[in-house]
Amino acid sequence: MRSAAAALSVCVLAVLLHWICWTDRSAELLGFRAADRPKADVREVLVGVLSARHNHELRQAIRDTWLGYLKQHPHFQNRVLVKFIIGAQGCSVPLEDLEDQYSCSQLELSEAAVSGQEMAILSVPDSSALLQSDVPVLSLDFKVLHSVVITQLGVFPNKPPHYLKGNITVRLLQVDQEEAVISARFSSVSPGTAADGMFYKPVEQFILPKGFEGTLLWEAEDSTALMSVNTSALRLNNGGGVLHFRSIEEGTLPHRNALGFPGLAGGFTFTVYDVEVLSEMLRGRSGRQKIREAQLKGEDEALQEESLRHGDMVFVDVVGTYRNVPSKLLQFYKWSVENADFSLLLKTDDDCFIDVDAVLMKMQRRRLTHTSLWWGNFRQNWAVDRVGKWQELEYASPAYPAFACGSGYVVSRDLVQWLASNAQHLKAYQGEDVSMGIWMAAVGPRKYQDSGWLCEKECYVDMLSSPQHSAEELRLLWSRKNKCGDPCGCS
């Protein structure tokens, strides 16, 4: 009996030793040996997950998949810290009253917009306000915030009043389009009709819908034919808030694709389209505001409850909109250097699948632990958009500096420290990924290119990240990985 018990003890001891060796070997492959395990408050990797306030289902899917795996893993739970990055404030403007869906700018509409009358963007009662242009082409950029119809195009007269010198063409173009939507030609023999200190000609009437972005061009054969106006004391009529004009102040830098210099050589008249719909919208504004306030209160309460329950959320002092994501990221960088001890920071989004085993293993195998490191999948010579979700009007170059796709990238602590220290001086551009590229261009980090950080919604067995997934898709990818090691499918 004793010999049997002794034999059994030897077997149990052998199995135990084998298990210990296997787990240590697994951890060693990933660079987490027990011998060099740091203190519990020191983390090898800090993961920041950009998350919209309302994306609680995506956050829960991450907690149920790769985040839950990290928390339960004996070698990873004290080496990797994951935090969701949340805007502390929600946008208080109802969706129907926003200028666009990407910001929190409210439509400043007034009763003047529903007058039903034809309006001019300006009048020149005194011809002494006019001055000769020193360039042959002037341009005015504007955006339509509620549908309008342009009825006439106009030019300023030369001195003396009611005289036009040379030939002038006025064209309205949609941004990034070459063909004119409407146009009119003015000359000394065909100057048009004089009204309010300007010559006007009627044009074919098109409905310019909400969101239309256009450029009005005044073109002359030589600059002496164009008259301009001192814009410093000028206020354009936006029709009660239905139009938004870009800056034409003296000294304004022309946009990189501008066809003319910012300025005015005339104007146009317009009417507001569908006044009845606009009137109804104005009447319902106060009711929508009350509903939105109640929604925000419920959203705040739900977020606080979620934060208390999970303890994995960082609220940064930013209004949670798409346009504010770069500022949101900078605020998280400030939080991270003040509140966490880490060597590397992995940034990702709440709709991204992350193969944490592959990331940590490659991190160790490639020894990606040095300073001035930026590890990601880099886009190069990426064109700057003038319209749409990725519209960028502030960055002057036609292409961005190299930037890593936002689905996942890793930066070393020293770079995070630099970003945090300079956050108040860094300009936020339209997206956090391109903003990061512009900011890092000043530092010149070592870029480690890795196509495993996917830029589009794709799936490969050796991928590190994949973006744009639903909560259900995140769970499916993770379950496949656990079942057969391939998130893309098990045969």
Curated annotation (Swiss-Prot):
Pfam families: Galactosyl_T. Its EC number is 2.4.1.313. One of its GO terms (cellular component) is endoplasmic reticulum. It is found in: Golgi apparatus membrane; Endoplasmic reticulum. Beta-1,3-N-acetylgalactosaminyltransferase that synthesizes a unique carbohydrate structure, GalNAc-beta-1-3GlcNAc, on N- and O-glycans. Has no galactose nor galactosaminyl transferase activity toward any acceptor substrate. Involved in alpha-dystroglycan (dag1) glycosylation. Belongs to the glycosyltransferase 31 family. This is UDP-GalNAc:beta-1,3-N-acetylgalactosaminyltransferase 2. The lineage of its organism: Eukaryota, Metazoa, Chordata, Craniata, Vertebrata.
